[in-house]
């Protein structure tokens, strides 16, 4: 829902944290959850480590809205579903988030939330959708080769998202 955007953005940033450059993270250099590669694509020019370290929530908020919230049509998703899908999109991609929602709603799975997908999702029970999205997400994460390194943090994150999204639903 449109009115949930600011809260959802803040909750995602809480999980994303600050600057990291973990050697086992395939995303590489990251700050506030934004990878260097994605930030360079967004700005359409190269950035330095100093640029990455200097990122602020105000700087990255439009990036998150354009690249994640808008792509999953967060303004139009039911409350709670918006947060669960948005956090999933940030962590594992907008296509995966859309596909999970489409699968749950029983519509054609193409990875893009269009009018038919949106209508079907809106007819579903929001708490059930949140539960299923989070379960599917954990199943996916547990099968990643990096789960041994990052799994504990991902599990805490998904459990927190599930609890907060369920409260919102």
Regions found by a protein language model. Name each.
Residues 1-169:
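Cell-wall polysaccharide-cleaving catalytic domain and substrate-binding groove, primarily
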